[in-house]
Structures are given as C-alpha cells and as structure tokens.
C-alpha cells in the first residue's frame, strides 16, 4: 500500500494471516482469523493488539502539571506519580480536540497517549498553547511501539514473562522499567476493550520479539493476535467512545454523557471551561443514547435517526453485538428523545427500522478497578 506508514510490527502480520487495511494512514491488520473469533477470544481468553500507530508526547519542566491542567478537562491535581488519567482536550467552545490518557511520571514529567488519527493535530494544538509555561514538549511517537494485551487471562499469561508482580499494577496505574521477556518496558493496567489487560510500551526494535514472546507464553491458554475489527466491536460493547464517531470538535463531553471527566469545579482554568460551565447550566440540547434495533438489520455510522417523520439525530456506531447477539448502536439525538424506552426509527438504506432507546452500558466491564 503505497504512501502508508507502517509500525515496527508490520513484518509479523502475514505470519498470523493478517488482512491489511489503511487505517489513519497506517498499514494495519483488520483481522487475523476473523473478527468474531477474535472478539470472543478477548472476552473469554486473551488477545494481543498492535497499537503502535497511537501517538505519544512527553511534557516536562517546572510548569508541566499546570500546563497539562490548562489543556485538559479532568483534574490533573489528583494524579499521583505512576498513575494514569482519562481526559478530554477541548477547544474554546467545549468541542473535543481529542480524548487521551495522561501518565504522570513525576511532578515535572508527564506522558500523553493520543489517538492515531489526531496525532499531528494534537501535537500542534499542545505546542500552540505553550505560551509562557515553562515546559518542553516532545513528540516521541516514532521512538515508541505499543502493544495491548487484553482479556481475563491477560495477567496470568503475561506474568510468566515479566519480572514484577502484575497484581501490584492496579487499574489505571503504571510501572516503568518492567522487564518483559528481558526487555525494558512501561506497563500500565489500561485498555480499550472492557476487559482486564495491559498496555505495553517498548522500544520499536523490541516490538517483534515481545509480540512473539507474549503469544508463545499464552499458547496453551489460547491467546491470539487481534485486528482492528474486533478492537472496535469490543470497545463499542463496553461503551468506550471513538473519536470521529461519538465525538469531534463540534461535540462536547457533556453531550455524550462524559461529564464525570469534566471537572468544572477545579480552581484552575482550562481551555473550554467557560463554554462547558454555560452548557451545563443551560442543559444540553442533544444526548448520546444506546438503542436496540427491533427490526432485522444492522445500524451503521451516519444512519439517520427519525421520529414522527423528522430527523432527530444520527447513529455514531452500530453493530450486531457478538457478545449480546443483537443489533445495537449508539446515536446522538435531540435531548427530548433520549429517555430510555423512547421508540424511534433508524433509516437503514431505504427502510425505516424500529428501534428503542436502551441503557448505553451494553456490556459490564471486567477490568480490575481496585
């Protein structure tokens, strides 16, 4: 695929039967043995993902904490060393520039993990807002490879090849300089599947050996490589949002039910705070809802949501859920139609199929929260 970027793991995909697609400008595997098989593997056993296309940036210096707080909606002050925080980075109108993870190494040292499709935009946004803050910002994306190992058996398998007790790495905590198969890595108990698991950051030159080592360690348990197809169905079932679907620069965190990650009472100002305070006071005019399709069909991103002949919103993500075995979706609709139990139609091609609003927590997470 001419002109596309590759990750350090590009050479291993075909070994495992990977089918390659263009994703965010990268050659990446959409599936290996089939996305349904891979989806169930992560839900029941453990699966390994190449997520080296994600972006990473280091923010260091005397004002690092203050600067991060200025950029982010969540309360950075609560972060202790070696902890991870999920947050939004918004524009002045409260629209989402990106959702990202903030890793705190020390008071003057933070590590940001950003979405692949937003990598260049995010780094530019961060640098453009440096102002008088005493910080240094470095895009380290090309010097890091990232693997995600997810599923109920992930800890048991990974424990075989690491030099630390993984039970000591609690949910949304991290440990640096962990030896994984003898290679120095950063390991965090984080993920994007709704299952317990780890994200492993390593040197690009170590990625292939780590990939093989992890899959070999989990051979008896049935660990498998997982592609982008299952990554999306897994995150969707767990109601984890995807940038470009559930959020963008015109959608605020409050509209998609993510107010928990917007700390409007923090003393410090952050970009978009005033707009979000105003929106919270006035109330949102649209909301993200879960829905189940009652007629036969599959809802897809962009399909219109219709009530009494009027378009009231659009589907952000929809699938036939592999775990729940029914057609469900997320939709951004006018607020007055967001109540659970509300019936509406989804326009699937030329048909208007019946649907009903349901709780958007489709799947109960099995992450270790303590």
From Swiss-Prot:
Species name: Clostridium botulinum (strain Kyoto / Type A2)
| Transferase recorded as keyword | yes
Q: Which GO terms describe its molecular function?
A: aminomethyltransferase activity; transaminase activity
According to the record, the segments passing through the membrane are none
Return the similarity comment.
Belongs to the GcvT family.
What Gene Ontology terms for biological process does this UniProt record contain? glycine decarboxylation via glycine cleavage system
| Keyword annotations from UniProtKB, A to Z | Aminotransferase, Transferase
InterPro entries per record:
GCS_T, GCS_T_bac, GCST_C, GCV_T_N, GcvT/YgfZ/DmdA, GcvT/YgfZ_C, TrmE/GcvT_dom1
Q: Tell me which EC number(s) this protein carries.
A: 2.1.2.10
Determine if Transferase is one of this entry's keywords: yes
What this protein is called in its record is: Aminomethyltransferase
Kindly give the Gene3D superfamilies that the UniProt entry links to this protein.
Aminomethyltransferase beta-barrel domains, Aminomethyltransferase fragment, Probable tRNA modification gtpase trme, domain 1
Task: Explain the purpose of this protein.
Answer: The glycine cleavage system catalyzes the degradation of glycine.
**One Pfam family linked to the record:** GCV_T
């Amino acid at each position: 695929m001419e002109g596309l970027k590759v990750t350090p793991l590009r050479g291993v995909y075909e070994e495992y039967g990977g089918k390659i697609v263009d994703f965010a400008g990268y050659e990446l595997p959409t599936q290996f043995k089939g996305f349904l098989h891979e989806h169930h593997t992560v839900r029941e056993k453990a699966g390994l993902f190449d997520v080296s296309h994600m972006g990473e940036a280091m923010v260091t210096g005397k004002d690092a904490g203050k600067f991060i707080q200025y950029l982010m909606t969540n309360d950075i002050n609560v972060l202790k060393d070696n902890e991870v925080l999920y947050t939004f980075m918004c524009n002045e109108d409260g629209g989402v520039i990106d959702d990202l993870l903030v890793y705190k190494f020390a008071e003057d040292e933070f590590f940001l993990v950003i979405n692949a499709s937003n990598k260049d935009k995010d780094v530019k946004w961060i640098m453009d807002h440096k102002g008088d803050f005493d910080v240094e910002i470095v895009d380290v994306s090309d010097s890091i490879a990232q693997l995600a190992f997810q599923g109920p058996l992930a800890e048991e398998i990974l424990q075989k090849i690491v030099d630390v007790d993984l039970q000591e790495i609690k949910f949304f905590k991290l440990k640096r300089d962990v030896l994984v198969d003898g290679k120095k890595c950063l390991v965090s108990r984080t993920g994007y599947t709704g299952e317990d698991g780890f994200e492993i950051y390593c040197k690009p030159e170590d990625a292939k050996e780590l990939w093989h080592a992890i899959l070999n360690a989990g051979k008896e348990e049935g660990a498998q490589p997982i592609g982008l197809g299952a990554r999306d169905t897994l995150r969707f079932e767990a109601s984890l949002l995807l940038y470009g679907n559930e959020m963008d620069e015109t959608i605020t965190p409050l509209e998609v039910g993510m107010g928990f990650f917007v700390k409007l009472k923090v003393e410090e100002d952050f970009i978009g705070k005033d707009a979000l305070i105003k929106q919270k006071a006035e109330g949102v005019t649209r909301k993200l809802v879960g829905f189940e399709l009652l007629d036969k069909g599959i809802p897809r991103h962009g399909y219109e949501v219709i009530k009494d002949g009027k378009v009231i919103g659009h589907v952000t993500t929809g699938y036939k859920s592999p775990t729940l075995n029914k057609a469900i979706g997320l939709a951004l609709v006018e607020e007055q139609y967001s109540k659970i139990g509300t019936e509406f139609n989804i326009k699937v091609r030329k048909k208007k199929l019946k649907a009903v609003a349901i709780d958007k927590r489709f799947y109960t997470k099995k992450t270790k929260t303590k």
